[in-house]
Amino acid sequence: MHEMAICESLRVSMEEAARAQDFSRVTRVRLAIGAFAGVEVEALRFGFDVVMQGSLAEGAELVVLEEEGTAWCFDCNRTVPLATRLDPCPCCGGERLVPNGGTGMTIKDLEVV
């Protein structure tokens, strides 16, 4: 379950930000997670609650913003939305696609005190 490792990294990032920006508590975390990032959101929520215990983010609200997956279609030469990596191009039916959006995870913002 790599979601626990993601939560550990998130905790470290928040602790570093707290030292650099002089805050002591995080009350809300907004994460943007791409459809192709390979993150199970429910497992991430569970891991977040466990990993944040005893930290500056204990009890913080986790808000997940799900980003659409997109890919470049080499057959019709454009970026198209995809529900899964295995879907054909919704415009031309082509299968020569390379994901170019919705592949990552980003901390959008933190609500702090």
Curated annotation (Swiss-Prot):
GO molecular function terms listed in the Swiss-Prot or TrEMBL record: nickel cation binding; zinc ion binding
GO BP of this protein: protein maturation; protein modification process
Database matches in InterPro entries: HypA/HybF (IPR000688)
Positions with a binding annotation for Ni(2+): H2
Superkingdom classification of source: Bacteria
UniProt cross-references to Pfam families, sorted A to Z: HypA (PF01155)
Keywords, alphabetical: Metal-binding, Nickel, Zinc
Binding-site residues, Zn(2+): C73, C76, C89, C92
Keyword Plastid belongs to the record: no
Its biological purpose: Involved in the maturation of [NiFe] hydrogenases. Required for nickel insertion into the metal center of the hydrogenase.
Family: Belongs to the HypA/HybF family.
HAMAP family noted in UniProt: HypA_HybF (MF_00213)
The name this protein goes by in its record: Hydrogenase maturation factor HypA
